Regions:
Chain B
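Sec-dependent bacterial lipoprotein signal peptides
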Residues: 1-30
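Short, charged, low-hydrophobicity "junction" segments
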Residues: 2, 101-104, 248
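Acidic, low-complexity intrinsically disordered regions
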Residues: 13, 22, 70, 177, ...
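Generic detector of short, well-ordered, non-transmembrane alpha-helical segments enriched
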Residues: 26-28, 59, 146
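Active-site-adjacent structural segments surrounding the nucleophilic cysteine of cysteine proteases
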Residues: 30-94, 137-139, 203-206, 210, ...
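Conserved active-site-adjacent core of cysteine acyl-enzyme catalytic domains
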Residues: 31-54, 72-74, 83-201
Length: 133, 284
């Protein structure tokens, strides 16, 4: 009984120590430099946003937006309100649907317009967009 | 993107030019005119010309290495097509794979970034940068894969000018160039020394090209490119983070500390920056 208790205790202590060490290892115990490439992949989202903003500046995209009766400045403001994760998922969806297609320019335009119209409650293409009306 | 291999048959060096001319003549006959307004979404000058790109006559099968040598010699390097071929050419395939074009440029310490449309292609030429393009000079069912270097274009004369591995410059009408480039999936490659930035490409694409230099251990070139990028995007900490890492990899701890401190002053809360800065300080 005593021995069994001791063993249980020992196992518990060993396990919790391991757990603590494992979590700390991620934040503390670092023997080498963290790579640039991983950081770019992790933090590139703010630039995904500027990419989308850049697409909104395109003449053909603006013309489509204006034709729908939307003020492009309002479209930009709405895009700025999306979270990084939402921006990332738009781009992921674009990439998926663009794979193998030669008409990237057209599809991009369609995506940007759909994004704007989604936000304005005219369409519901992206599943995370919140309708403002 | 086709993992295709290019280049002509060894004994066809002579026939090649003839075939080219035949193919070009035939294709030109049925080509739809190139619609500049539909194909471009940015304004580019009516004509542009990159001076001083050398014409290098390619050795058999070496249009890939020859193209890279032309672009790198234009930038001041004295590299030869044989030097590049040692890094890029696949003898068994009788050509140079697209990925090896990119990789060999990076292993030679150059910024290498692909582009895939006319906006970017013509913007680079207008900025004074030659662009390597992957073309099928034949037909879909009978491909003649080829790499050439676009050095100029002129909408008024309806001409794209290429240094194409022959003695003379190759001149193609836009519609014909478009067909040959479309069959190469619009694959283009900008190769620049790391102290110059391409006119096309987003900040992230250029950052990734710089990080790729680190991956092939071209740390000095990577450091130069990170500095060049930091001058262009001074508010972005990733350039200084990369600069710190590239300097660290070269054993320059003080330089690394300086760059990482700069990154931290721009982005105080990023754990990667803090961790690397702490690591460098612990070694100083």
């Amino acid at each position: 009984m005593g021995i069994l208790n001791l063993t249980k205790r020992g196992v518990a202590i060993a396990l919790s120590a391991q757990l603590v060490l494992a979590t700390q290892a991620v934040t503390m115990a670092q023997a080498e430099m963290l790579g640039t490439e991983a950081a770019i992949n992790k933090y590139a989202q703010h630039s995904d946003r500027s990419f989308l903003m850049g697409e909104l500046q395109r003449e053909d995209v603006r013309a489509e937006i204006v034709a729908l009766g939307v003020d492009p400045a309002e479209a930009e403001a709405r895009l700025a309100a999306l979270s990084d994760a939402e921006v990332a998922s738009i781009l992921a969806q674009m990439e998926k649907d663009n794979a193998g297609a030669d008409i990237i320019g057209i599809l991009f335009t369609v995506f940007i317009v759909l994004l704007v119209t989604d936000i304005l409650c005219l369409t519901r293409f992206f599943n995370f967009t919140r309708c403002v009306r | 993107m086709p993992d295709a291999v290019l280049q002509l048959h060894p004994l066809r060096a002579l026939i090649y030019r003839l075939f080219c001319l035949l193919a070009l003549g035939w294709l030109a006959g049925c080509a739809v005119p190139f619609d500049r307004d539909a194909r471009l979404s940015v304004d580019v000058p009516t004509r542009a010309f990159v001076p001083d790109v050398p014409l290098i006559e390619q050795e058999a099968f070496f249009c890939g290495p020859a193209s890279l040598a032309m672009v790198m010699q234009w930038a001041g390097s004295d590299v030869t097509q044989d030097d590049i071929a040692a890094l890029a050419f696949s003898p068994g395939a009788g050509g140079t794979y697209l990925a090896d074009m990119i990789g060999s440029a990076r292993r030679s310490g150059q910024l290498a970034m692909t582009l895939h449309n006319y906006d970017d292609l013509l913007a680079e030429i207008a900025a004074g940068h030659p662009v390597i393009v992957f073309q099928n000079l034949g037909l879909g069912f009978a491909p003649v894969w080829h790499y050439g270097v676009v050095t100029a274009y002129d909408f008024d004369r309806d001409a794209v000018f290429l240094n194409s591995g022959q003695q003379d410059q190759m001149v193609m009408p836009f519609a014909l160039f478009d067909r040959t480039w479309a069959r190469g999936d619009y694959w283009g490659l900008v190769v620049l020394p790391p102290d110059r930035l391409p006119a096309s490409g987003s900040e992230i694409e250029i950052l990734q090209a710089a990080a790729a230099l680190e991956r092939v251990d071209a740390f000095a070139a990577a450091a130069v490119l990170y500095q060049t990028g930091a001058a262009r995007w001074p508010d972005s900490w990733l350039w200084y983070f990369g600069l710190g890492n590239a300097r660290y990899a070269q054993g320059d701890l003080r330089g690394a500390r300086q760059a990482l401190s700069r990154a931290r002053s721009i982005a105080p809360d990023v754990p990667e920056v803090r961790a690397n800065l702490a690591q460098v300080r612990s070694e100083l």
